[in-house]
UniProtKB/Swiss-Prot annotation:
Pfam families, A to Z: Fn3-like, Glyco_hydro_3, Glyco_hydro_3_C
Name assigned to this protein: Probable beta-glucosidase E
Gene: bglE
Low complexity bias locations: 827-838
Known function: Beta-glucosidases are one of a number of cellulolytic enzymes involved in the degradation of cellulosic biomass. Catalyzes the last step releasing glucose from the inhibitory cellobiose.
Lineage, opening ranks: Eukaryota, Fungi, Dikarya, Ascomycota, Pezizomycotina
UniProt topological domain (Cytoplasmic) ranges: 1-128
Region Disordered: start-end pairs: 1-51, 485-515, 822-841, 873-909
Skewed-composition ranges (Basic and acidic residues): 11-45
Amino acid sequence: MPKSYTPVHDSIPEEDHFSSDDESNFRLHRIDRSASRSQSPKENEGEPSILAPLVRKSTDFETYLDSLTEDEQQLLSASKDHDIEDLDRFGDGTAAARRRFSESKKRRKLLAKRGGWRAVYYSKTWWRTLVVVIIALGLLVWGFLKYASTRGDIWEEYDMPGPDSYFPTPKGGTLKHWAESYEKASKLVERMTLIEKVNITTGTGWQMGINSKLTISGPAALVGFPSLCLQDGPLGIRFADHITAFPAGITTGATWNRDLMRQRGAAIGLEARLKGVNVILGPSMGPLGMMPAGGRNWEGFGSDPVLQAVAAVETIHGIQSNGVMATAKHYIMNEQEHFRQPNEWGIPYALSSNIDDRALHEVFLWPFAESIRADVASVMCSYNQVNNSHACENSKLLNGILKDELGFQGFVQSDWLAQRSGVNSALGGLDMSMPGDGLHWADGRSLWGSELTRAALNTSVPMERLNDMVTRIVAAWYQLGQDSWESPAPDGDGGPNFSSWTDDEFGFRYPGSPGDTSAARVNRFIDAQGRGEEGHWNIARKVAAEGIVLVKNVGGVLPLSRSPRANAERPYRVGVYGDDGGPAAGPNICTDRGCNSGTLAMGWGSGTVEFPYLISPIDALQGAWQSDVQMTPYLRNAVMPADTSDKDLCLVFVNADSGEGYISAGGIHGDRNNLFLQKGGDTLVHTVATNCGGPTVVVVHAVGPVIVEPWIDLPGVQAVLFAHLPGEESGNALLDVLFGDVDASGRLPYTVGKSLEDYGPGAQVLYEPNAPVPQVDFSDALYIDHRYFDRNNINPRYEFGFGLSYTKWELTNMKITRLQRNPSRLPAARPPDAVAPPSYDANPPLANESVLFPPGFRILSKYIYPYLPTLEATTPPPPNPEASGSATDQKPHRTKPSDAGGGAGGNPSLYEEVARIDLTVQNTGTRSGQQVIQLYVSFPHTVTESSGQKSHENIDFPDRVLRNFTKISLAPGQKMDVNMTLTRKDLSYWSVREQNWVLPKDEFYFWVGYSSRNLPLGKPFDP
């Protein structure tokens, strides 16, 4: 009997085992059987078999190879053909050739396992992979070139120069109401070291704070300036415990209620302060909603620049009333999720949003200008490019428009990894780099940090610019009174008291640093929501209720009765249908709400929060009726006709979700694929409405407009409510409107078209790249949303500003009063700076050991430091001998300041009131209610500008534009006198030729009414 066979791989560490089908194993078995026929067991006992390796002590593979016997080595290397050929039983060399080939394969495998270059050279898998990669790359290039050849006309269309430049960056501290803060800041900054200045401008890196999404890299400890905590977001405090999940921005915009907008902002600000947050990353006013399918439209307030601006201003006032810095984001033209970030979609470049100067000013800049008038402390620049220049280094946008023309006094921070260069972004107007990491997440390599220290020393970034960056940040801190903040109760230390990365009380101090295990108390579980009737749930519920828009109500089916007339023989039967009507497996079941499960109360992405609780519609409906009512839930989107036919009332819940591009859910990659209901919602409504024994009421929870054409005209669909994204009080707020506890007073913050095409070619998301740098053309941007419908005579299903009420209204006695006599065509001359900005020593400090890591300094992996490892490349360049005069005599080129500037939000004369509109509003119905009075302006029909020596250019305008609104509450029969004003800017257009706002000297027409197409009052006005 042959000696027992020990497989070769039994003595190799587990990770180095051969596969079960390894051919070398099979060959050894064959040879073993062959040898056993010519040798007896006795003969084999005295010498080791070449087929059975000795017992090995070492498990290291290379040691194992070195310990092979000579016979084993000869077999494995196949170095002596005649030794193998002796085993040839066929005698014709065929078997020998096969064995040589087989042993050569074994040799390659063994050498491949030795590591190093041999592992690569002898690895068949590696070579196969290389071939596949080369073929794939070839196909990719071929396909890309083929696509390019078919789309050449489009590529050529975008072969355009970049934007105008604006240098140097205007200094902050030129407006009187910021003067005191800048004076304090300058005294602090002039005492800072270079290291401290850089430290303030650069984030510490992703997950490098113990408590927050991000903490600005270390404090300026020597002068007492703290680290600052920046935290999302637009509808509450992201990642935090014991906070309120407020209704989303789109719901807030649908209230058209300035007071509620401010209350919501104040509550968010108070919760941020109690949680130790210095800067809240909201409100969002970009995207504006040019593309109705845009993934993050729901974070903003609606698809109109004036509505968006009013809501943003009220939110900012609310947040900053509690001493927390608000952030106006995303600046600017961040209108879709596809291709907004480099590398996120497999393309190395972010898309470019291409926009003309007039549309930029009149549409997309409008909310930002108003936010700056409201003294917003921070502006966040966006990921995308604008006219082929990254938004976070676009000097025209940051220096020219934001800091010069609009007079922004706060600081510009990058969106997380939106910074794409070091020196260019500093010179272009960026003041703070977030999260500190450079071109890739959590790699510990910053474009600023130590590189900004080096750039300041070698004068690539002038000290004048660095000092302004730091001063802007510190001045904003003083402006909000954060120098006098008390420590958060009960035992805070002035910093954030919650963790973004764990729900446990104790956790890692630097969770983003591999290998660091230092721990700290990271969660103090401080309740910031408020208690009882003063709790913030009450504000959330009011906003959610007033954000519900009633768009259809046949026969007054709503409001519902809590005591419906029951059939004498059976109880009143109510069916509740749809997954959206019930709870999910948990309100926070998906990270950043990245799934559509259960009732939809917010979209997904970084603009979300953790629900402390979520009242679903079915939860609220359980105790809604007072009489004998039998309610049966069918919380699924597939129902049978038999489930509906015996019901006296059918409530159908459907939705449409979207969010940020880093999450994909249900086949939606950020931006919606279309405007239809999701998860079979259209079929569900059709099935229920055509079979229900009574009226069908449809409730739509959606991130924006949805196409309702498949079912809106069905006789069974008697009421429809757009409930938007209502937050934690979803079900309770819905019942307030369903049963008439409050009036249906929401109004659409967008237009509901009959198809996606109704919104125009410029409103379509770019789903496939059309160039190496994807290009999105906003040539129709002046005609956003309802303006496009009006210009092209398209009948929408429901127009912008539309919404039904439970009562009736009448508008009368419209009167226009001139507040200025013969106002000039152009605004007044730009006023000089009210105060001089701070001045510092412009010379860089000496490059010495003060900028190096201190001796014995403990360096955390991936943490962003301002220190340099060496003094390499810190020497300023020598002066140019050909330049005349000394270096200090040389003055850099300075772009001429804008005539449209001179104050917060622009030239102060732009905001002088030129007209007042008075009217009387009466509630002529039988119920108390609320009404939104909307004021629209039509510009003169013929406005021309000189475009040359002889020719004149006709200036085109939208049919009418929203310019003001107010919301009132009246009892039955009650009257109220209402007035609204218009400013010079409201009646001006942006002249590209004159680079200023121009007031046409011809007849305007002012409209007053209930929506963009229901305007019963109107009068001409000649300024």
